[in-house]
Amino acid sequence: MNHIEAIQEIIKVAPEATQEFEETYKTQNSFMVINVFTKQIQKLILKKDKKVLIQCLNKMNEIYRKGDQTLKNAVESIFIYSLDRITFNCENAYKNLIFEKIPLGLQKAYLRQVYKSGL
């Protein structure tokens, strides 16, 4: 899967992202695409829209598993790196729920990043 195919997949689970993807500079590379999707996930976390949030987390995992190397790097560099920041203000119970619902592939990438950084 390349970043153009990822956009189509993202729009299926987060139709609100369509508007952002209409701005062409946001569709030019994998990093911009994952940045838009990460912002959509952050909005869902703030709205506490658990059903759509879980669908989006699963879609992010699918992009991570099936995406080309650039998409995988973008997911690790943007989404995984942002997880702590976007869940920082959540109540502990809600934060735990989010991390429980993150698919295994993304959980492993998150743990690799946390342990690699020496934290």
Question: Across the structure, where does each feature detected by a protein language model lie?
Answer:
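HEAT-repeat alpha-solenoid elements in large eukaryotic scaffold proteins
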Residues: 30-39
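Eukaryotic acidic, Ser/Thr-rich intrinsically disordered low-complexity regions
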Residues: 91-119
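Eukaryotic alpha-helical solenoid repeat scaffolds
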Residues: 3-9, 88-90, 118-119
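Amphipathic protein-protein interaction modules
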Residues: 47-98
